[in-house]
Structure formats: C-alpha cells, structure tokens
Amino acid sequence: MAGFGLPNFGQLTEAFKKAQEIQQNAQALQDELDGMEIEGKSADGRASVWLSGNQQPLRVRLDPELLSAGQETCEAATLEALQAAYEQSTATMKGRMEELTGGLNLNLPGMGG
C-alpha cells in the first residue's frame, strides 16, 4: 500500500548499507592514518617535524647549525615545521575521509566546512 509518508524502503536500505560500509572501513582508515608519517619542514629546511595522519607527533629533527643560530630562530623554525606538518596531515585526513564517505557531506567536526 502506497502513501502514509513512509520513505522508499529501497533507498532506506541502500543508505543503511552505505552507512555499514563506512563503519567497516573506518577502522581500516584509522589504522592507515596512524601508520602514516607526514613531514613538515621549516622554510629554510633546517627543522623537520613528523606527524601521523591523525596529527600525533612522531619526531623532530633539527639541523645542528639551526641549534647554534639561537633560541628564537630555532623556535621559529620548529613552529614553521610543525605548522607545515599539521596542514599536510589535516589535508590528508580530510581527503581520506571524503573518499571513505563517498562525498556524503557529513560535516564532521574538525574537518572544515
């Protein structure tokens, strides 16, 4: 019997299947992001910071010459490298999430708008 304001069950079933698929792939994506090492460098290349795809800090490398350049220079270069790594890591995460959700536009927190 048609009507009664009920949704098309074929569409509802398809949406449910898509949600299940996303959920199943979410853990694999989490593991993939955790395993990534994304490097950010200072403008002069003397400081490098590595983050995972989930923005977890992994390691820092500072050129010995940078260390002798003074505290402010060293801090500025480290911050530049951290910002670059964060931007790349965030962009990677956002791109992978968009692939996972198939463009469903879920507007997830922390993923821009």
Curated annotation (Swiss-Prot):
Transmembrane segments: none annotated. NCBIfam families: DNA_YbaB_EbfC. It is found in: Cytoplasm, Nucleoid. This is Nucleoid-associated protein SYNW0027. Homodimer. Its main location: cytoplasm. Disulfide bonds: none annotated. Keywords: Cytoplasm, DNA-binding. It comes from the Bacteria. PANTHER family: NUCLEOID-ASSOCIATED PROTEIN YBAB. GO terms for cellular component: bacterial nucleoid; cytosol. It comes from Parasynechococcus marenigrum (strain WH8102). Belongs to the YbaB/EbfC family. InterPro entries: YbaB-like_sf, YbaB/EbfC. Pfam families: YbaB_DNA_bd.
